[in-house]
Amino acid sequence: MKNNILFCLFFVLISCNDNSGSVSRDYNEPGTPLILISIDGFRWDYFDKTETPNLDELIESGVRSEGLIPSYPSKTFPNHLSIVTGSYPNNHGLVANRMYDEVFDEYYYIGQGSTAARDGKWINREPIWVTVENQSLRAMTMFWPTSDAEIMGVRPSNWFAYDESITNTQRMEQLLRWIELKGTKRPTFLASYFSDVDDAGHIYGPDTEETKEAIRSVDYEIGILINGLKDRGIFDEVNIMIVSDHGMTENYTDQVIFLDDYIDISTLELIDQGVFVPIRIEDHLPSKIDALFSSLENAHPNMHVYKKNGFPESFHLTDNRRIQDLTVVADDHWRILTHESFNPNRFPKGDHGYDPQYESMHGIFVGHGPGFKSGYIGPRIQNIHLYEMMCKIMDIIPASNDGNPSITTTFLQD
């Protein structure tokens, strides 16, 4: 009886927090549902670290890639948005987790309670749930990064503002409730998100027992979804995609580059620190930029400095106004800090954001359902190609994007 009361209380609570979309429209009958789930920070080789029976089940009768290559920078919000827009960060607008925009004269930052992260004005490309809604189908999202923002005047039919107190099990149960809806109320696209593996990787490092436990825990939650679909007799009638935004690499306190050992930072604004440091020079004088660039260019063998339009071509960062005058970038495992910000007692054991050429930054793509082949392992692919694939699976017309639909056809049923 007590358990029944608790479940009812949760259902009432979560229903009250369930928000409806901002546009009134007539909806069409739904197509085959697609469920998209992100396991933040799940590195491509984590399948080999510990037991993942539920993910293994999806792979055995579905598909996976050898790895999912993130866009630069391999950070959480830029890559979640790259996955759902098919666009490089330069084009979709989120070039980092923390940014400054001179036109807005505002800072963008992430975290529970961030108002900027829920403001769609920062986003310049159409996410998949907007594409779905614009074609008179329903999208419903639970905690996918940026899905609680109104973007281009559109929200999912149902969505949740991020609340870390809502357990992973409750998230899966919500997806199952949504998919039980009938007729035109039923969603064609559903999405959710797990942070556990990323959290453990940061705190303990990628190759630790704590991270392995987080992997097993999230796999268990995937099992709740699988079994819930089986109980409803629709497991093989639903397309499922499991992805991650990036991987994870080890960080060490003896692999820190102190920026203030090489330049005077007293008149500079460091927008962020860690894997890379965007440097804002208030007056943007070319002479100041050139002088700082010269001081940093060969300052440390594991640190690289780029002017606003001087990034490697593979980074696909060119003309976005949120890119600062200079950006210093660390090699794999290294961090760039100031002496003031360095705290060995609060130092991450793992991090991401590095050049996607490092395999440690690669994530996962797993697909299962009537739209995918069975028992197929394919090549590594860039995450910008998934948007076109999702559109094809749902039989909808994609918006403008940077992806190539031919890249992912190898994973799909003929």
Model-identified regions with their sequence ranges:
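Acidic/histidine-rich catalytic neighborhood
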Residues: 237, 244-284
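Active-site-proximal N-terminal segment of extracellular/periplasmic enzymes that hydrolyze or transfer
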Residues: 19-64
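Active-site neighborhoods of enzymes that stabilize oxyanions during catalysis
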Residues: 272-377, 381-389
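His/Asp/Glu-rich, glycine-adjacent segments
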Residues: 87-88, 92-205
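A long, amphipathic alpha-helix that forms part
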Residues: 169-180, 197-238, 290-291, 390
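Short, structured active-site-proximal loop/turn typified by the sulfatase FGly-forming signature C/S-X-P-X-R
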Residues: 47-92
